[in-house]
Amino acid sequence: MTDVTIKALASEIQTSVDRLIQQFADAGIRKSADDSVTAQEKQTLLTHLNREHGSAPDKLTLQRKTRSTLNIPGTGGKSKSVQIEVRKKRTFVKRDPQEAERLAAEEQAQREAEEQARREAEEAAKREAQLKAEREAAEQAKRELADKAKREAAEKDKVSNQQTDDMTKTAQAEKQRRENEAAELKRKSEEEARRKLEEEARRVAEEARRMAQENEKNWTEAPETPEETTDYHVTTSQHARQAEDDNDREVEGGRGRGRNAKAARPAKKGNKHAESKADREEARAAVRGGKGGKHRKGSALQQGFQKPAQAVNRDVIIGETITVGDLANKMAVKGSQVIKAMMKLGAMATINQVIDQETAQLVAEEMGHKVILRRENELEEAVMSDRDTGAAAEPRAPVVTIMGHVDHGKTSLLDYIRSTKVASGEAGGITQHIGAYHVETDNGMITFLDTPGHAAFTSMRARGAQATDIVVLVVAADDGVMPQTIEAIQHAKAAQVPLVVAVNKIDKPEADLDRVKNELSQYGVMPEEWGGEAQFIPVSAKAGTGIDDLLNAILLQAEVLELKAVRNGMASGAVIESFLDKGRGPVATVLVREGTLHKGDIVLCGFEYGRVRAMRNELGQEVLEAGPSIPVEILGLSGVPAAGDEVTVVRDEKKAREVALYRQGKFREVKLARQQKSKLENMFANMTEGEVHEVNIVLKADVQGSVEAISDSLLKLSTDEVKVKIIGSGVGGITETDATLAAASNAILVGFNVRADASARKVIDAESLDLRYYSVIYHLIDEVKAAMSGMLSPELKQQIIGLAEVRDVFKSPKFGAIAGCMVTEGTIKRHNPIRVLRDNVVIYEGELESLRRFKDDVNEVRNGMECGIGVKNYNDVRVGDMIEVFEIIEIQRTID
């Protein structure tokens, strides 16, 4: 055959040149497109391709599925059909040629060993037969010799007796005895030797026979090969197993492969299950035992449990908190034993009560176990430590919080700085949640936080002070220091934040700057010109006077503080405000402290977590990142976080979810522990207090800060007689769930800047619920006060309506002593309660029984007129006494 090139061969076999070159290379032949190919090289390539692709499969798997229906009896005599499906799988593996050769060699060696053993057994049997024949011949010769010796001895004795008649009978008897003893010893020695030889021959023959039988058995039984794997029918019901057996007999009955046929053959090695229904029944019977109390031998399937001989000491892992029931489970004891141990230690507890780590450690060690204390925030610490926080710190913009009393012009001042109209959008002209803004000035950027000035927003203002670098205290020049001004000073001092005082409304005629300085100096805010540290800047939010000086003072104070932050790396910050938007979901206003917050980052925020889906600045514009001191609104959290929560960017969303769930569980445990503690502490107070009226409220507001402020204000209204109870609160509109909760708890639905949806209004109309909307917190508090006032029991007041002087006393057979009186003040009315005064001391308190004027009964007697008064059940009336008539009136109480 002539040689062809690679190209020609590729076109001939209809494949690409590159693939053919690669196949030659795999076969170990290096060729190019223009090289020629010899017949030998073609044969080499063909052999390689057959070995790679033409080989038969090494393994073949057969699967079979059969279905059947089984009717089983049920309750009430009804039968129930159960669908049974049996799946079988058999795998046949092709032997490797080398493996086949090895198995053949092993079989040949085994046959040779068996043949050698058989020959050795035959030779041993022949030797044993020969030895036996020799022994029998020797014994026969010995017996003949013994008989001959006896006959000769008898003849000698006869001759000797004839020749020696004079021998005595005693000598003959002695000689006979010695001869008998010698013969007996010889016979015993011969029998012992013969017995040993027979036993040795029998043992050798038995061993040879046993080896031959084992070899024959191993030769006749085919060894188990991997060609057929064991099929397991694992069922979970007696009926299913029975149906499986019946189905096998129907399908494979002619071929003898049913389960009962399998049971007749020896069981395969390694089969862990019973091969037939009979085997399973036998195993169950062995476990149950026979009739009449005669139990069979214990089965291997029967579980044997023995009580421990002594107490088992365990390693008990205890977290920061644990319930009594969980502690008992960890120690493998009953909960009552743990409660007894705690009672011995002087602590009372229930099985579901949460106990602290120290108490659990004492109880576990008292019961003899080893305690391993575990910190439950290890996961949280690990997540927080796995953060790229950057290295180099750069200067950042100051975060400035504007504080002050209500209506002192905080928002108007910031409004002028930002050149926008924020104040006009606030209900009632007051700020009701924190606004975060950053403004660009000629000297740099400043971030402003505008906090409400109303007393109800104390917690919001406290959060603002914690997140800020500088506090601008706005004081009206015409109003001076007010309660919220003092509170703002306290917050700033508690947070150790420097103060810059902006004296607003300086353009008013009644403005008095010195008065403001004097009043603030009483609370530790000293002006710089007086030797203090606070800068006083007179400004006017309307005219714009002193605004530039205020900004310069803020930047100067920031320069002194040397504010720096890491710009690169994973961000961290704080939640300034949060609310639930109907279209966007949970929204949180975040102030970034360090790092850069990017869109798509995974954030952990208190009890919530999520991926930042979108970020907007205070103008509502989309941004992709936010650096230090920049406030942004983020979307994508799992829920509405609490205002003031820490915001941290983490790497793994799964771990962030685990930390958030752990925090939720921890908060719940702490809350339950606190409730339990308050129940124990207030036990006697709850036993002694009378009936207390409650005003139940379901509160919904637009932002989280408003919910907190309103809740705090309403809870402070509670008195000993009427208590305000917030049944439910949240952020967002009033839903059907809120209305149902209010109906179940007889509560008032309060919506602050939110409205009820259609489904909620249906429930409200059907249940006739009290729904109220508010946009100003003053109105809400006033109406709740009015509702509480209606629940107060009225105050009873005694009002004196008349006073009469006793001028004379005379007797009446019907009423006893009658006092003749002159009305000196007011009006005396019949059947009213009276007091009898003697020397201005009350000596009797009772009721008027009779009131007459001139013999006529009258209902009242006016001032300056005489009358006769009969006092009920009292006769010790004297001249000069004063009779005071009064009435009890009810005065409706109010909540101050």
UniProtKB/Swiss-Prot annotation:
Pfam families: EF-G_D2, GTP_EFTU, GTP_EFTU_D2, IF-2, IF2_assoc, IF2_N. It is found in: Cytoplasm. Residues 404-411 are annotated as: G1. It comes from the Bacteria. GO terms for cellular component: cytosol. Residues 429-433 are annotated as: G2. GO terms for molecular function: GTP binding; GTPase activity; guanosine tetraphosphate binding; translation initiation factor activity. Keywords: Cytoplasm, GTP-binding, Initiation factor, Nucleotide-binding, Protein biosynthesis. Residues 450-453 are annotated as: G3. GTP binds at residues 404-411, 450-454, 504-507. Residues 504-507 are annotated as: G4. Residues 256-271 have a biased composition (Basic residues). Residues 540-542 are annotated as: G5. Residues 395-564 form the tr-type G domain. Residues 94-307 are annotated as: Disordered. InterPro entries: DNA-bd_dom_put_sf, EF-G-like_DII, EFTu-like_2, IF2_assoc_dom_bac, IF2_II, IF2_N, P-loop_NTPase, Small_GTP-bd. Coiled coil: none annotated. Belongs to the TRAFAC class translation factor GTPase superfamily. Classic translation factor GTPase family. IF-2 subfamily. One of the essential components for the initiation of protein synthesis. Protects formylmethionyl-tRNA from spontaneous hydrolysis and promotes its binding to the 30S ribosomal subunits. Also involved in the hydrolysis of GTP during the formation of the 70S ribosomal complex. This is Translation initiation factor IF-2. It comes from Klebsiella oxytoca. The gene is infB.
